[in-house]
């Protein structure tokens, strides 16, 4: 059986990266929420 996690750094950045988050209103909400919570790492 194929594993569900097939690592790919390009896809990782495109989907979960900082610039991807900043590009949409909801993504910015995610970053704001993580800042408020005090996360050391905001995005991939």
UniProtKB/Swiss-Prot annotation:
Superkingdom of origin: Bacteria
Keywords: Ribonucleoprotein, Ribosomal protein
GO CC term (a single one): ribonucleoprotein complex
Ranges of biased composition (kind: Basic residues): 1-19, 31-44
Keyword Ribosomal protein: yes
UniProt-annotated stretches for the region Disordered: 1-44
Keyword Ribonucleoprotein: yes
GO BP, sorted A to Z: translation
GO molecular function: structural constituent of ribosome
Family: Belongs to the bacterial ribosomal protein bL34 family.
Matches recorded under NCBIfam families: rpmH_bact (TIGR01030)
HAMAP family given in the database record: Ribosomal_bL34 (MF_00391)
Protein name: Large ribosomal subunit protein bL34
Gene that encodes the chain: rpmH
């Amino acid at each position: 059986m194929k594993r569900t996690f097939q690592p790919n750094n390009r896809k990782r950045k495109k989907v979960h990266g900082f610039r991807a988050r900043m590009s949409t209103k909801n993504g910015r909400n995610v970053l704001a929420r993580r800042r408020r919570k005090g996360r050391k790492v905001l995005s991939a």
